Amino acid sequence: MLYPLIRKGIFALEPENAHDLAIKMLHLAGNPILNKLLKALLACPSGNEKTVMGIKFKNPIGLAAGADKNGDAIDGFGAMGFGFIEVGTVTPLAQDGNAKPRQFRIVEAEGIVNRNGFNNYGVDYLVENVKKAKFDGVIGINIGKNKVTPVERGKDDYIFCLNKAYNYAGYITVNISSPNTPGLRQLQYGDALDDLLKSIKERQAYLAQVYNKYVPIAVKIAPDQTEEELVQIADTLRRHKMDGVIATNTTISRDTVAGMKNADQTGGLSGKPLQHKSTEIIRRLQQELKGEIPIIGSGGIDGVQNAQEKIVAGAELLQVYSGLIYHGPGLVKALVEAIR
């Protein structure tokens, strides 16, 4: 009930300033006493347990990557009731990302455009935060490549991050679908994807022996695929026996927001305008994968109805981020109560 008032204050700030403030506040909410108070205030139920990728999730609702890039606010977000939190995207080296301003609201469509460019403090910083977290759910770590790394050497960055994150992650996500790192999406196709996933699976097998535990690896894909590209991606994921696929990242399309303020800003569009596009990708992926690889649905979830649509389409877990900005933590509670 309070969130519409809070949102007015948040939306009076520039989007990135509002985000940074929220992260600082949620970092403070990691304090054990404040964390208990926040949990009591939000009163989110524990939800329905679900086992996916061999992991037991206390409920199927997660926080999407991009919200807590450096793992600074894991316990604060955890108090909202999430079953899992995906931190990152993180790269081997710290990097500033693209020039500001780089986040823009499309308020009338409940959308957000970002061209952040994987701004983060580096994988070592993030891993230290993951190690300190008290969150009782699953923590996923989303990994990417540095902007300065040539695409043809991109797999080196993913392997570097995999080595660093493996022992501390509930699962790891390979992000090859952000539109804001030049050339990154090339890694989704053909021999480039084949080569990358082969290297990642080999390293996963090695690390599983070293640490005596198997940490599942998912791949996050874009929504802007042709039919042929999607079929090819699904086939490659299946051949390499990937543990999961996240559908989807942000879109470069502006079909759903044409003519609106900030619609012409360069970057990836998320939120409600992505809702149907991401659900359709989930549906098509499910048809191709036939349940062999679990799908994590992400993109425009802002209520129980469209969350259910993604489950019906084939998603086993769900992630939210933009919907949280527009609707507040009450969204998490509603989804946790409703989604099985």
Curated annotation (Swiss-Prot):
PROSITE patterns linked: DHODEHASE_1 (PS00911), DHODEHASE_2 (PS00912)
EC number(s) from the headed UniProt entry: 1.3.5.2
Residues that hold FMN according to the record: A65, G66, A67, D68, K69, T89, N142, N175, K220, T248, G271, G300, Y321, S322
Subcellular location: Cell membrane
InterPro entries: Aldolase_TIM, DHO_dehydrogenase, Dihydroorotate_DH_1_2, Dihydroorotate_DH_2, Dihydroorotate_DH_cat, Dihydroorotate_DH_CS
Active site: S178 (nucleophile)
Gene Ontology CC entries for this record: cytoplasm; plasma membrane
Matching SUPFAM superfamilies: FMN-linked oxidoreductases
Annotated CDD domains: DHOD_2_like (cd04738)
Pfam assignment, any one: DHO_dh
Residue sites binding substrate per the record: K69, N114, R115, N116, G117, F118, N175, N180, N249, T250
Pathway per the UniProt entry: Pyrimidine metabolism; UMP biosynthesis via de novo pathway; orotate from (S)-dihydroorotate (quinone route): step 1/1
Keyword presence, Metal-binding: no
The keyword Membrane is annotated on this UniProt entry: yes
Membrane-topology annotation of the record: Peripheral membrane protein
Keywords, sorted A to Z: Cell membrane, Flavoprotein, FMN, Membrane, Oxidoreductase, Pyrimidine biosynthesis
Catalytic activity as recorded in UniProt: (S)-dihydroorotate + a quinone = orotate + a quinol
Origin: domain of life: Bacteria
Cofactors that this protein relies on: FMN
Cofactor binding notes: Binds 1 FMN per subunit.
Predominant subcellular localization, coarse grouping: membrane
Functional summary from the UniProt entry: Catalyzes the conversion of dihydroorotate to orotate with quinone as electron acceptor.
Oligomer and partners: Monomer.
The protein's name in its UniProt record: Dihydroorotate dehydrogenase (quinone)
Native organism: Mannheimia succiniciproducens (strain KCTC 0769BP / MBEL55E)
